[in-house]
């Protein structure tokens, strides 16, 4: 009869772009992959592996970084567009461990989901659950982070690498980042945010959005107990957040904006925004 699915075993698979040392270079490799294609949906390829994966890439400072991925379960779906090009990728990891020079130390996660869609605008959605952060970074609110989420749409042609030429071209073509949902739940602190951002003529972030915070009073107390801020600064920060934001039970909502090199929370200037830096500058 007509097969419901066609399985294939792949001993080793390697994907990448450019040559090692070139801007935009990256490589990903995995072994012992099971791939399944369903004739009724030939544009979708389901993949799964329990073997470790490795990756290397050139970062924004033109330095080669490595990343090793170990997971109890690693599944993914690759979608091929009608033109034969890669259209979308989604992955799911369980009991995930990350190590390598791309990180300051080992990172563990109970689960990680990621998806990216390349059709027209680029849509990205990444969420990590029950993360254990590396001790090397001296985590502010402990080593355990409950949720880390970023869901965004990037308009304009995606830059091929982190260089002034590529990023300028993206900006000049009207490139924007629309953060539809960002979330960090870390200790008592629970922050969600959304906004739309771009780059100004001097390569500084510009845009606006809204952030909502819960557990901020408790988190300020933790920072004070760890001597990371003084009691006086803690009192000023607590009062400032409550004055600038709109109270809704235990939630504070804060409008923020980035313009002319200044980050403002409400009408108050909170930080100076510097231009982006590129390799060789």
Where are the model-predicted features located?
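Short, surface-exposed coil-to-beta transition loops
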Residues: 28-31, 190-194, 251
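A beta-strand-loop signature enriched in Asp, Gly, Thr, and Trp
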Residues: 176-180, 190-207
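Outer-envelope beta-barrel architecture signal
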Residues: 6, 122, 203-205
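N-terminal beta-strand/beta-hairpin edge segment
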Residues: 1-119, 129
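Low-complexity, intrinsically disordered segments exposed to solvent
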Residues: 40-44, 50-54, 75-77, 81, ...
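Acidic, serine/threonine- and glycine-rich low-complexity intrinsically disordered segments
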Residues: 92, 97-187
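Short, surface-exposed charged micro-motifs
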Residues: 77, 113-115, 181-183, 194-196, ...
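Extended terminal
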Residues: 1, 167-172, 198-203, 208-210, ...
């Amino acid at each position: 009869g007509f097969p419901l699915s066609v399985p294939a075993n792949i001993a080793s698979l390697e994907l990448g772009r450019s040559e090692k040392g070139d801007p935009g270079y990256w490589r990903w490799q995995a072994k012992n992959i099971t791939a399944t294609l369903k004739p009724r949906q030939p544009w979708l390829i389901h993949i799964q592996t329990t073997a470790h994966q490795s990756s290397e890439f050139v970062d924004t400072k033109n330095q080669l970084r490595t990343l090793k991925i170990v997971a109890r379960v690693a599944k993914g779906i690759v979608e091929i567009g009608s033109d034969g090009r890669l259209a979308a990728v989604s992955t799911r990891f369980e009991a995930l461990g990350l190590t390598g020079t791309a990180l300051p130390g080992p990172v563990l996660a109970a689960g990680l989901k990621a998806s990216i869609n390349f059709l027209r605008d680029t849509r990205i959605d990444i969420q990590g659950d029950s993360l254990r952060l590396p001790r090397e970074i001296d985590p502010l609110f402990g080593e355990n982070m409950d949720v880390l989420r970023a869901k965004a749409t990037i308009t304009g042609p995606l830059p091929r690498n982190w260089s002034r030429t590529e990023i300028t071209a993206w900006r000049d073509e009207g490139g924007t980042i629309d953060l539809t949902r960002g979330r960090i739940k870390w200790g008592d602190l629970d922050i969600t945010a959304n906004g739309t951002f771009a780059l100004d003529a001097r390569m500084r972030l510009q845009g606006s959005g809204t952030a909502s915070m819960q557990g901020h009073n408790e988190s300020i107390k933790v920072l004070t107990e760890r001597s990371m801020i003084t009691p006086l600064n803690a009192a000023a920060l607590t009062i400032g957040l409550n004055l600038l934001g709109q109270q809704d039970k235990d939630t504070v909502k804060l409008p923020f904006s980035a313009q002319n090199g200044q980050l403002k929370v409400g009408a108050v200037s909170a930080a100076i925004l510097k231009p982006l830096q590129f390799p060789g500058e």
